């Protein structure tokens, strides 16, 4: 559904090391937050963090199309865009050095084109970008990359995953965070977990966040996931558990979810 009037769109952009995901909310609308499909008519919501350039021509592709084009044609594939931008070293592409932050800006610009499913980038009223860690260098990178988008809004914010999880919890019904709340994020050969717990014996109430990382060498191992779940939940009062990461959408956790 495209917007008929002048409503603004609030965009949430999760920028991972290998994938990105875009959600949006139309102000004044009764519709829920919508996550944009990266493939028209499908339920594929993750966008590979990659670009490819056609050799000898200033033609670029992004996401799954970039990977496909680089495999089928003589395209030059560039992955790990966030890491490259953070490192700051020029990237040699087709015989020329290119600013890695400019590559990240190009990826952001192309991927935000998915908003055409709802509206266009002219109507972005606010943009929130989340990433795993938000230190001084990452803040510099994201600020420079978003300035290159030339959006018609100054409401551009950045959050770490820890901050995002904290604020998300606070806006949920209290029964979902009355006791410990756990988020599990499926990453590269590891499961990163965030546990939030509130101390109600203080005024004001103080929230604590614990971050842990568990090795996960065997992909989609139900047995290993069950071990992690026991370490996190055994003898604990748990209000809610969230699972994020594309691998969790597949049907492999038979015992872990019991």
Where are these regions (language model features)?
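A generic secondary-structure signal
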Residues: 110-118, 145, 168-172, 227-232
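Local beta-strand N-terminus motif with an aromatic residue
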Residues: 124, 178-179, 237-240
């Amino acid at each position: 559904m495209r917007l008929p009037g002048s409503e603004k769109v609030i965009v949430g952009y999760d920028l991972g090391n290998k994938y990105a995901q875009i959600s949006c909310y139309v102000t004044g609308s009764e519709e829920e937050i919508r996550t944009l499909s990266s493939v028209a008519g499908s339920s594929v919501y993750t966008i590979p963090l990659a670009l490819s350039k056609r050799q000898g021509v200033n033609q670029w592709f992004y996401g799954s199309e970039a990977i496909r084009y680089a495999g089928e044609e003589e395209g030059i594939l560039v992955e790990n865009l966030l890491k490259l931008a953070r490192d700051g070293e020029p990237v040699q592409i087709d015989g020329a050095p290119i600013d890695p932050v400019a590559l990240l800006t190009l990826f952001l610009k192309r991927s935000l084109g998915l908003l055409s499913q709802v509206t266009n980038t002219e109507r972005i009223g606010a943009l929130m970008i989340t990433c795993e860690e938000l230190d001084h260098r990452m803040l510099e990178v994201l600020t420079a990359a978003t300035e290159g988008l030339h959006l018609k809004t100054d409401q551009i914010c950045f959050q770490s995953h820890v901050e995002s999880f904290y604020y998300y919890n606070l806006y949920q019904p209290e029964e979902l965070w009355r006791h410990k709340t756990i988020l599990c994020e499926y990453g590269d050969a590891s499961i990163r977990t965030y546990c939030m717990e509130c101390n109600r014996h203080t005024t004001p109430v103080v929230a604590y966040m614990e971050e842990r990382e568990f090795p996960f060498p065997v992909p989609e191992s139900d047995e290993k996931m069950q071990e992690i779940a026991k370490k996190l939940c055994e003898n604990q009062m748990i209000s809610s558990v969230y699972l994020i990461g594309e691998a969790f959408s597949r049907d492999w956790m038979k015992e872990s979810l019991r």
